[in-house]
Amino acid sequence: MGPTALAFGVLALPGATGRDLGFVLAAQAVPFILLMPLGGVLADRRSRAAVIAVSDVILGALVVVQGLLLAEGTATVPVLAALNVAAGALNALWWPAFPGLVPAILDDRDLQSGNSLVAVVSNVAFIGGSAVAGVLVATVGAGQALMVDGASFLVAGALVYSMRGVTRPTPSGESMVRDLREGWSTFVSLRWLWVLVAVWSVINGVFRGVFEVGGPVLMRRSFDGPTSWAVLQTAMAVGFLVGAAVAARLRPERPLRFLTLASFGLPTAILTLVAPAPFVVLAVAFFVVGMQIEFWGVLWPTVLQTHVPRDRLSRATAFDAFGSGVLGPVGLALSGPVIAAFGLPTFFLAAAALCALALALPLLEREVREMARIDPEPNAER
């Protein structure tokens, strides 16, 4: 619910443009990226469930405050940006902890199916949230939609907190700085990992600019605003759901090669926004993108969980998320000015070309092309 409600809440402010939306989103993305390594260290030293739960509760309160400000008509771009700085910091604690939760409670042979189940359930909620957000924004306003979204974080935090004793790691006895350095050493020693992270840094910068700024602006100009955007978000979410279900059964011998090749539908989908294509074509394109993203959502954590030492998993995941997302704020911040200077069609064309070029590069790396799938034995050591 949050992305849709926040996007149209910002765009509904007096005189607000895509540039303002990009600024608010970048305010959240910058601390999220910069603090991610620290979040990884914390998740490898503390109960991952407790880290997730506390982050959820505080984040829920922040989202409710944003909703109240929008509902009362007192919200401004600087205030929303400031609140989103805090939200980004909390997300930086949450994100590295979550991938370590699944292998802490499942046998290794069940990791892929467990990752798939998490993705399916999350996407069912995302589908419902996207639909409800569109209806709430169109009928009662973005502020009310954000308040409902914030309440969902409070409930989630309470549920996850009940698992806090299951995921308590063994303390390393080292300082946080040393743990951070060890996580970095693990990350850079895995060539396939940092190559893909570098490539996806570019792709994520493009993706966030296109789908978080360019998309909502296009919907306001050429379609029915939040209602149309909610339909496309729901189509993508259905793609997430189908992709997660399909990915549970996929056993590619070369998972990284498969994932990279499967991602070429993304630049194709961006091209449908140029003209733009008929709305039904856009919906199909968003559905396909959702499927491809969720292939990564299921298979990529499985690769990390089976190829990275378990006691360093959250730190490696943190550097993965840090590197992959570091250009996200750049994409968000630049997309508004680029759209204003060159127009939406040129913006989407350039984004599609850059995305296609970036996807081709990792196929030149042998470790990406040739890495084999690992099938864990039952009751493998965690």
Language-model-derived ranges and their functions:
Residues 1-382:
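Alpha-helical transmembrane-bundle signature of multi-pass membrane transport and export proteins
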